[in-house]
């Protein structure tokens, strides 16, 4: 079991209705799965490529202790964008962001609506 699955299961057991879990593609060794509550959304894309960024509370702490940043390409960007307090799940490789931070580059993303 992955940490993303376990945190999603914990949220469900505590009464939160969350999104479907996101899964890594088979054979993708650098892929990570995550699930958590949004604390920050970058709604306006400063470089104009149409992606979105989320920061979620995540015990894995891929970006910082207790926090994981998720980069979502334009084609996967949910509409409307979820906001702080909403639950999302994501899976994808961990890559270095423009500020040197570790973040998940989402290949799969699910949002609670």
Task: Describe each model-derived feature in a short phrase.
Residues 35-37, 89-93:
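Residues within well-ordered beta-strands of beta-sheet-rich folds
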Residues 12-33:
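Short boundary/loop segments of OB/S1/cold-shock single-stranded nucleic-acid-binding domains
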Residues 46-70:
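OB-fold (S1/OB) nucleic-acid-binding surfaces
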Residues 4-13:
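Bacterial N-terminal signal peptides
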Residues 73-91:
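Short nucleic-acid-contacting surface segments enriched for D/E, G, S/T with interspersed K/R
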Residues 29-50:
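Structural detector for short beta-strands of small beta-barrel domains
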Residues 42-45, 60, 92, 96:
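Sec/Tat-exported extracytoplasmic proteins
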């Amino acid at each position: 079991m992955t940490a993303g699955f376990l945190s999603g299961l914990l949220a469900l057991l505590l009464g939160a209705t969350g999104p479907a879990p996101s899964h890594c593609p088979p054979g993708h060794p650098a892929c990570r799965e995550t699930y958590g509550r949004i604390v920050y959304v970058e709604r306006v894309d400063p470089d104009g490529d149409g992606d979105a960024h989320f920061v979620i509370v995540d015990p894995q702490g891929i970006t910082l202790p207790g926090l994981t940043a998720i980069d979502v390409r334009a084609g996967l960007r949910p509409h409307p964008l979820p906001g702080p307090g909403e639950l999302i799940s994501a899976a994808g490789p961990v890559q270095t962001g423009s500020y040197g931070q570790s973040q998940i580059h989402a290949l799969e993303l699910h949002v609670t609506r």
